[in-house]
């Protein structure tokens, strides 16, 4: 396994650990999720290019489309929560809270 794959895997793990540790604010959670998607995109692109998978060449582009949709929904949720409650705490997203 080359050093590039190890670095990208470590970037994914660091983003996952950031998502698990800093989950009180919605903005930091969205940023960690974007880091995970970016490292996953780079890893998929490198695997497709190195192994010459012609049938799977569209897979990284499809992942980017889903990442863009996730980012748009996350930012709209962030704007809605910050306009409603004044903060971006994740605890405000609990629908069962009275």
Swiss-Prot record:
One of its GO terms (molecular function) is NADH dehydrogenase (ubiquinone) activity. It catalyses: a ubiquinone + NADH + 5 H(+)(in) = a ubiquinol + NAD(+) + 4 H(+)(out). It is a multi-pass membrane protein. GO terms for cellular component: mitochondrial inner membrane; respiratory chain complex I. The keyword Amino-acid biosynthesis does not apply. GO terms for biological process: ATP synthesis coupled electron transport. The chain crosses the membrane at residues 1-21, 29-49, 61-81. Its EC number is 7.1.1.2. It is found in: Mitochondrion inner membrane. Core subunit of the mitochondrial membrane respiratory chain NADH dehydrogenase (Complex I) which catalyzes electron transfer from NADH through the respiratory chain, using ubiquinone as an electron acceptor. Part of the enzyme membrane arm which is embedded in the lipid bilayer and involved in proton translocation. Belongs to the complex I subunit 4L family. Core subunit of respiratory chain NADH dehydrogenase (Complex I) which is composed of 45 different subunits. This is NADH-ubiquinone oxidoreductase chain 4L. The gene is MT-ND4L.
């Amino acid at each position: 396994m080359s050093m590039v794959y190890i670095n990208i895997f470590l970037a994914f793990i660091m983003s996952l650990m950031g998502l698990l540790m800093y989950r009180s604010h919605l903005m930091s959670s969205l940023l960690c999720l974007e880091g995970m998607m970016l490292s996953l995109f780079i890893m998929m692109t490198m695997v497709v290019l190195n192994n010459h998978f012609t049938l799977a060449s569209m897979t990284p582009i499809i992942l980017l489309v889903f990442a863009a949709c996730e980012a748009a929904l996350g930012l709209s949720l962030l704007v809605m929560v910050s306009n409603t409650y004044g903060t971006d705490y994740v605890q405000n997203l609990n629908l069962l809270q009275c």
